[in-house]
Amino acid sequence: MAYNVLIVDDSATMRALIRKVLTISGFDIGEYFEGANGQEALGILEHNWVDIILSDLHMPGMDGTALVQTIKKHEMWRNIPVVLITTESRPEVIDPFLNLGVQDYIQKPFRPETIRKKLTGILGEAITPDASETESCDF
């Protein structure tokens, strides 16, 4: 099954790195959608179906907090899995998102293997990549 992925981060470099990690991790990606903030992400969701959303928290304009709150209140989007990819790790910041229905979070910087394991747990499949492609780098 090919997955449509929405990556939301104000850094174009980070969005490109996440795309690369998903590719080398063996996920069957149908289409990538990208937004630099929550407002762009909502515009994408209005016109496209996505299977998972990977979002930063700290972005200009509509941040990740407002984005997650909007998604989880919207009847068409509330069941789309959301994974935060953020520099935050403090429970007082992360726990409210988990209580809202966010599936998980990945702390930046991250290892490609971390994304592969967490998304495999959510999406249920990934091809095991060549270890030499993922073990030697952090993003």
Question: Residue locations for each model-derived region?
Answer:
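Receiver (REC) domain active-site loop signature in two-component systems and cognate sites
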Residues: 59
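Two-component/phosphorelay signaling modules centered on CheY-like receiver
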Residues: 12-33, 100
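Helix N-cap/capping motif at the beta->alpha junctions
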Residues: 34-43, 64
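Alpha4 helix (beta4-alpha4-beta5 surface) of REC/receiver domains from two-component response regulators
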Residues: 66, 89-104, 117
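A Lys-centered signature of the CheY-like receiver
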Residues: 10, 108
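C-terminal output helix
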Residues: 110-119
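Short amphipathic alpha-helix used as the core "switch/output" element in two-component signaling
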Residues: 43, 65-78
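Active-site residues of response regulator receiver
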Residues: 56, 86
